[in-house]
């Protein structure tokens, strides 16, 4: 078995981050993920999550489980000597750390995606990414350090808390999958340089919103239903749905609707990290028009339609969307 530490120090990482910086970051992520997993387990015993505390910047209810996970990740990430600041889906503004003038990197995170389903024992996840700052070393960081397109990410990944705890990440040199070993209390390599399978097996979309979809999306769904080789699978947990489609071969769709005209998923915290993993696994992503990774963000909490999966399935859904654009 190859541990996460052994893997990092025995393989080349990208030119933007040293092995020491990468490993020290993953020590923090690994430790925090263990704590978050315990929060989730305790949630089903003590119901720590049930009370809806307040609404976040997106107008969504935050639960105690959201707030605990968010605080823990912020407190842990700020201990990394080279990270200047963090932006979280649960925070209105980015947070700078005391080492902001000299930290090389900025960190973005969705601390607990799918948390509202945690009490149903549905798999939930943490999504994260890392960028090099664009402001000069020696000055305070600013919002422009965070407002970079997804193709500028130097690391992205997610942790899936399910039947096992899984870490999936890329440093732009392939996608690597690690599984947490509870006896050794660390992650071990499960799959190296993983790519989507060649078959297109699954489409994942919330069809309860069907009446609010554009004609192109409706036609695409109909084409999937008419194909006996494609099945529909949807849990409502982005990380769980994407991970299944990555392993089995498929596409995840969250289009804009009449209610969410600009989409609902967050570009910086959800779409970009997942899109980079998809790209590195020989897949693709789109907002229905252009590659997600090529979008220049204008605001920190920007939303976007999101289509991510195998290249052929993403290409086809783009074709349907553009083909029926003037018929909506």
UniProtKB/Swiss-Prot annotation:
One GO term of the biological process aspect: fructose 1,6-bisphosphate metabolic process
Residues in coiled coil: none
UniProt subcellular location: Cytoplasm
Single GO MF annotation: fructose 1,6-bisphosphate 1-phosphatase activity
Alphabetical list of Pfam families matching this protein: FBPase (PF00316), FBPase_C (PF18913)
Amino-acid positions noted as binding substrate in the UniProt annotation, renumbered to this chain: 206, 234, 252-254, 264
EC number assigned by the record: 3.1.3.11
Residues the record lists as binding Mg(2+) 2: 110, 113, 270
Cellular component GO terms, alphabetical: cytosol
Family that this chain belongs to: Belongs to the FBPase class 1 family.
Record-given protein name: Fructose-1,6-bisphosphatase class 1
Organism per entry: Wigglesworthia glossinidia brevipalpis
